[in-house]
Amino acid sequence: MKKTIKIIIITLIIAIALELSAIVAIKAYHLVNEATKTDAKEVTHKNDKKQAKNTDKNVDIPKPSSKISSDIPEKPVLGPVDATYFDDAVFLGDSRTVGLRAFGDFHNSSYFAKTGISVNSFFMYPALDEETGLTLTQTLSYKQYKKIYIMIGVNDAALVPLETFETQFFDAIREIQLLQPEAIIYVQSILGVTKNKELSDPYHYSNERVVERNNLLKSKCDGEKLVYLDVFSAFTDAEGYLNQFNSSDGLHLNSSDYDIWCDYLTQHALPVN
């Protein structure tokens, strides 16, 4: 009898233990399931955030324009003009400009030109124009010009250092600007000499020095109130000298070739209001 009761009690204890184990297992299952769902939600939320960030990265954000505003005026461009453009111009220079006055096409222009003149002769020594007898100061004081063309520097290219030429030339330019504040100043490149001329008189003439001076002049011009014109390029040979076919004496242009100079100028001018 007692054995039977013990067996029944043990059986009940085992049954209760099994039931408790089942309950614990079920609760554990539910807890794990809930945790899994929570983790899944968090992962989904994080993925959504990442996707949102990636989407933001892919959005085309307007960038500042690299183009200059069209309101800023561009520098004027050199272009063709007719001969009347030079009616209110004055040409300043040495014997080459004397030749331009004699054989060129700009008959209504004014001139200040003297054979053998150099940069320091412009204002330091009162050189007189060969035709009018006026000094440069007088020429520029009597009338206001719209354009001023200057070519000078070959006569002392082999003698005067580049630094001295620079000082003298741009001192002259400043004086001209004071007398003619509204004028466009065209700085024409200095015409060189032929190879034979340089070889026959290297003490006075140096084509290499002329090229150095032209490079200097070009670097100092702003393209607006001080405009560089590479006239020499219209007359150079393959070696960079003045072409012998354009100059019988190696220094001055043939009378029939001044029209090349004039043609170059009419094709390279700034518009004037």
Give the role of each language-model region:
Residues 26-88:
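N-terminal, intrinsically disordered, polar/charged segments of Gram-positive cell-envelope systems
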Residues 151, 188-189:
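Alpha/beta-hydrolase-fold catalytic nucleophile elbow
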Residues 79-168:
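Conserved SGNH/GDSL esterase-like catalytic core that processes O-acyl groups on lipids
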Residues 169-173, 214:
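Generic structural signal for well-ordered alpha-helices
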Residues 10-23:
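Hydrophobic membrane-insertion alpha-helices, especially the h-region
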Residues 180-184:
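A short helix->loop->beta-strand "cap" motif at the edges of active sites that frequently abuts
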Residues 26, 193-273:
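Catalytic His-Asp segment of secreted/periplasmic serine-dependent ester chemistry enzymes
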Residues 1-7:
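Positively charged n-region of N-terminal signal peptides that target proteins for export
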